[in-house]
């Protein structure tokens, strides 16, 4: 059996001087994202898609922003926790396709490192993870430079599914 999950996250930019973390990578920019955690929208979208694929709810259910235990937390920790939940159900990650949506900063110099972090955290080969970036041609909140969004599709399979 295989299943697919879709994840999405968006955050507005926060105060000047805060770090911008995307895919576990600190991306040079004058402002990071305002959030309860580290605001890593890419990790959040992938985590949300992973949980959704396994029928395990969503990011906010497992890691609520009302819980101080997650204040400022590295979102890679959340992804690894979600992976363990999914694996406990007999699933494994097949592949991930994720998109960052932002007018600025330029993401392309960093997508390789983001892909590598996601692959390591999901315990898959880098070839099983794709990260890309796009703009909205100056439309909507990302286009106006107000924040960044990310979306992801995650394919999972039952252990042994492709071994037949």
UniProtKB/Swiss-Prot annotation:
Binding residue positions for a divalent metal cation: 9, 11, 44
A Pfam family: YgbB
Reactions mediated catalytically: 4-CDP-2-C-methyl-D-erythritol 2-phosphate = 2-C-methyl-D-erythritol 2,4-cyclic diphosphate + CMP
UniProtKB keywords: Isoprene biosynthesis, Lyase, Metal-binding
GO molecular function: 2-C-methyl-D-erythritol 2,4-cyclodiphosphate synthase activity; metal ion binding
Function comment: Involved in the biosynthesis of isopentenyl diphosphate (IPP) and dimethylallyl diphosphate (DMAPP), two major building blocks of isoprenoid compounds. Catalyzes the conversion of 4-diphosphocytidyl-2-C-methyl-D-erythritol 2-phosphate (CDP-ME2P) to 2-C-methyl-D-erythritol 2,4-cyclodiphosphate (ME-CPP) with a corresponding release of cytidine 5-monophosphate (CMP).
Name this polypeptide is given: 2-C-methyl-D-erythritol 2,4-cyclodiphosphate synthase
Organism field: Alkalilimnicola ehrlichii (strain ATCC BAA-1101 / DSM 17681 / MLHE-1)
């Amino acid at each position: 059996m295989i299943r697919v999950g879709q994840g999405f996250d968006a955050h507005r930019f926060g105060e000047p001087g805060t770090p911008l973390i995307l895919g576990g990578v600190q991306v040079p920019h004058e402002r990071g994202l305002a959030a309860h955690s580290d605001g890593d929208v890419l990790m959040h979208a992938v985590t949300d898609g992973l949980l959704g694929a396994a029928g395990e709810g969503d990011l906010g259910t497992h890691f609520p922003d009302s819980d101080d235990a997650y204040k400022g937390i590295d979102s890679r920790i959340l992804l690894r926790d979600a992976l363990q939940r999914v694996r406990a159900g007999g699933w494994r990650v097949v592949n991930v396709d994720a998109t960052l949506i932002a007018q600025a900063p330029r993401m392309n110099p960093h997508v390789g490192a983001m892909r590598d972090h996601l692959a390591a955290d999901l315990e898959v080969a880098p070839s099983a993870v794709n990260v890309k970036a796009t703009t909205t041609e100056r439309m909507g909140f990302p286009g106006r430079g107000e924040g960044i969004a990310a979306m992801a599709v995650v394919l999972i399979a039952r252990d042994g599914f492709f071994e037949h």
